[in-house]
Amino acid sequence: MKKQGVLIAPSIMGADLACLGDAARNIEESGANLIHIDVMDGHFVPNITFGPGIIAAINRSTDLFLEVHAMIYTPFEFVEAFVKAGADRIIVHFEAAENLKEILDYIRKCGVQAGIAFSPETSIEFISAFIPLCDVILLMSVQPGFCGQKFIPDTIEKIRFVRQAIQTLGKEGSCLIEVDGGIDEESARACREAGADILVAASYFFKKDSINMKEKVLLLQGEEHGAK
């Protein structure tokens, strides 16, 4: 995926689940860059969402890049199914997976991008060891599992830390920083300024208000106000 400024990834988890095809098409028409699909197993997080069948249905409804955020235990078992369903990138959780290096390598061998997600309470002091193995590092800015939570301010310092690590390793452009949760205009601005590359939002895009989705994409990108 070619990066042009901050990338916007609406999480389809926030949509009306009876109308996912329409939601995917609306996301594409809004000018967003990709669709974020939260897969939850009811064990790693206390919620259950989508599986490979739903991913395949979304894939049939859009040409956008599909990113699967696997909030599940034993993600290795589902990689092939996610790829066959149309995933372009698979992100696994540091806290949920054993043998992370093997999983990341396997994901890439399957022909798609790979990433690691970190929950808010997880230390990222060791992040440099994983950056060369990833296309994206996802920082959870809320507790994983549910929409509608408030942005955790400590995430901003984590973004700066990961950005510095990427620069030190000479991996600018090859490993992106993604922030997921509690994203609105204010938190998006702080994330952009700290060095985030991708912003994921669910409730922000799908709540009922007077701002259409295309305008919301522009607001998160900062384009309406000439921001970074």
Swiss-Prot record:
Positions of the catalytic residues: 38, 180
One Pfam family linked to the record: Ribul_P_3_epim
Binding site for substrate: 11, 69, 145-148, 180-182, 202-203
Co-factor note (free text): Binds 1 divalent metal cation per subunit.
Cross-referenced SUPFAM superfamilies: Ribulose-phoshate binding barrel
UniProtKB keywords: Carbohydrate metabolism, Isomerase, Metal-binding
Classification via Gene3D superfamilies: Aldolase class I
Assigned EC number: 5.1.3.1
Catalyzed reactions: D-ribulose 5-phosphate = D-xylulose 5-phosphate
Residues annotated as binding a divalent metal cation: 36, 38, 69, 180
Pathway it works in: Carbohydrate degradation
InterPro entries: Aldolase_TIM, Ribul_P_3_epim, Ribul_P_3_epim-like, RibuloseP-bd_barrel
GO-annotated molecular function: D-ribulose-phosphate 3-epimerase activity; metal ion binding
Biological process annotations from GO: pentose catabolic process; pentose-phosphate shunt
Family: Belongs to the ribulose-phosphate 3-epimerase family.
Entry-linked NCBIfam families: PRK05581.1-4, rpe
Function: Catalyzes the reversible epimerization of D-ribulose 5-phosphate to D-xylulose 5-phosphate.
Protein name: Ribulose-phosphate 3-epimerase
Organism annotation: Chlamydia muridarum (strain MoPn / Nigg)
The encoding gene: rpe
